[in-house]
Structure formats: structure tokens, C-alpha cells
Amino acid sequence: MYTCDTCEEDLDLSLDLGETYEELETYGGQYVPLELVKPLEDLDRSYEQLKKDPQFRETFHHILKNYAGRPTPLTEVKNFSRAINGPRIFLKREDLLHTGAHKINNVLGQCLIAKFQGKTRVVAETGAGQHGVALAAAAAYLGMECVIFMGETDINRQKPNVDRIRVLGAEVVSVKRGNSGLKEAVDAAIEDFIFKHDHTHFCIGSALGPYPYPKIVRDFQSVISLEVKSQIKEYTDRDPDILIACVGGGSNAIGFFHHFIPNTKVKLVGVEGGGLGVESGKHAARFATGKPGVVHGFHSYVLQDEDGNCADTYSISAGLDYVSVGPTHAEMHESGRAQYTYATDDEALEAFRLLSKTEGIIPALESSHALAHMIKIAPSLDKDTIAIVNLSGRGDKDLSQIIDLDKRKKHS
């Protein structure tokens, strides 16, 4: 499927190294209206057929390499490590991909599936806007109509990405209901898909939603861990000790973790949006205060109010501001294979500024949450520890938001 110049093996989508979690025992499922059962069955059938098809595999490989810009580098950040009294720290540079984040890995694959199915239109939700930008770019490249649903709150704080989506030829639909955030954008996209599924593909941006989406997104994002597993050998003769990634829906994290899941010596850490602190009630830390429930067609941990309805969520990072989390993360949380924690807005902002000033790399606010956890644990780690943080996206999209925040603080 995907052959990177530095990797010793191909990304074979018919081989699932995380097979323990392929058929999820507790979470996942397909909780959808009857109108969507057949379209989802068709999607699963098409994907299972295509991932074994030589032409599809070659096309996907060509686009990943020559359009998306894979492989992405593994960068050791010595200045950052010294500043936090830390161990050997590396960044997996998904921020250097075309469109600025890991999202492009998944949308290219899903758009190719949609074209094989004869569909001419793709729709999606987006929070931070990175998924919307990636899908708009992929749709333009592959000659498809594209509609992006985005909560009004996120449109206001992610204007640069909204402008990029429109420049790329896609339509942006503002969703003005409820919390006007990512959950509401997903609701609107699903409604569109229900009525137009005959010619439309719903391109979910994270490893969640009804089956088979979690499987498909995980497989397309697993190119991240495939590359890391090979690239770290340039620096050491062993696997890393710890992997850290931010977790909104969880696609960058599950792709980053995937090829390391069988090696239980590698510690896997997902970092959620802690907002103003869990005690404040204004956060998106699903594993900290959420409980199992069903939302958007799948079963996982969900932030709920006392009546069992979806609670309002909050994070300075639009990409982490979601009420639930991918079902594979729920399984790994309960099995203990991965640890999940959170970082607050202030901690993420501190990490954002520190990496920018010490390494000349501006991280996305989403990725800054993972960096914040790295800062928090760094002094407690042995100096020969090898830690890798997935830099899932770049922070250009967040600059105006952060500058405005700084101005308000100065005048308060």
C-alpha cells in the first residue's frame, strides 16, 4: 500500500497489527438509522475489496508520496528538552504534510474509496478546520464536490482555515444550534448523508463513528507509526519508551500508536483537552469525567449531564472540543494498554510558546496539549528515555486566536 524510502516494510492494509482491538469487545458498533445500514455495508465491502487491489494500493502510495508529502521527518528537539530538563525527545512531524496536519492521510484514502463507488460528492464535519482543509484539497485534486459543516463557534475562532476551505473550492455550512461546536457539525453532516448517500460519501475525520469508520480511519492513519518504527532506528536500536499524542476523536493518536500496540514495553499516552480544569466543568476530558454512552452512531466514553444527555464541552483547541472519543481508545483505556490524561488551556499555551521559541516550530494547539504533558513528566524521566510526541499539526491556524487572547489579557 505505502512504501516509504526509509521503511523496511510496506503499509499493508490487509494486515492488522492491532488485531486484538479489531473486533472491539465493548465499544464501537453501528447505532444508525435504517437508511444508513446499507450505505455503511457498501462502504465496508468496498474498503475490504480495495485494500487488496494493486491499482488502489499503487494510487494511494503515489498520492501519499507525491501529493501529501510522505514520509514526514522525525526531529530530535534538543533545545526543548534542555529547557524542560527532559530526556531524548523527538517530534513526528505531521505538521509538515500538505495542508498542515495528519488529516490528509485519511481523506485521500476515503476520497479514493468514494470515487471507486462512483460517488461525486463528499461531506464532512470539522472543528479546528484541518479536516475540512484536507478534504477540500483532496476533493479538488480528485475532482469532487465538497461541503464542510462547521459549528459557528469554530468558524469564528478558526477563520484562517475557513478561508482556506473556501479558496479550495468547497462550501462551508455554518451550524448554529446547541453549542455550535464539533458535535453539532457532526449532527448536520450525518443528516446530509442520510438524504444524499446515493451520490455522497460522508468522510469522517477521526477514528470514531459507526463501523466501519474507526477501522478505516485507523488503517489510513497507521502510516504514522509505520514510519516512526523505522525512523527511530536511525537514532537507537530499540523502540521508544513512550509515545504521547493529543486525543480529540483520536485519529492522530491511534495512527501514531498502531504499530507499537503489540510491544507492551512502549508506554502509550493520550492527552485530552482539560479546558479550564476538570473541576470547572468546562473541559473535554472524556476519560476523566465521562461515562459509556452512544453518540453519532457508536458506543464509547461520552461527556454527559446528570440526565444522561450530551454535556457541553470546552477546550481552547477546537480539534479537541468533542463530546466523545474513538472506541479503540475506550478499549485501550479499560484494558490498560494506553494511559489517558489531560492538559489545561494554560498548560497547552505554555507548551505552544516554549516549542516555538526553543525550536522554531509552531505547533497546533491540539498538539500543544501533548507537548504540555511532555513538559509535565520530563523531570521524572531518566535521561536515556526515548520519548516521541506526535506533532499532529502546525499552529498557523491558531495564531490569531492566541494573539487576540494575549491582547485581552493585557487590557484586563
From Swiss-Prot:
The modification N6-(pyridoxal phosphate)lysine is found at K103. CDD domains: Trp-synth_B. Gene3D superfamilies: 3.40.50.1100. One of its GO terms (molecular function) is tryptophan synthase activity. GO terms for cellular component: cytoplasm. Pathway: Amino-acid biosynthesis; L-tryptophan biosynthesis; L-tryptophan from chorismate: step 5/5. Its EC number is 4.2.1.20. It catalyses: (1S,2R)-1-C-(indol-3-yl)glycerol 3-phosphate + L-serine = D-glyceraldehyde 3-phosphate + L-tryptophan + H2O. Its cofactor is pyridoxal 5'-phosphate. SUPFAM superfamilies: Tryptophan synthase beta subunit-like PLP-dependent enzymes (SSF53686). Tetramer of two alpha and two beta chains. This is Tryptophan synthase beta chain 1. It comes from Chlamydia caviae (strain ATCC VR-813 / DSM 19441 / 03DC25 / GPIC). The lineage of its organism: Bacteria, Pseudomonadati, Chlamydiota, Chlamydiia, Chlamydiales.
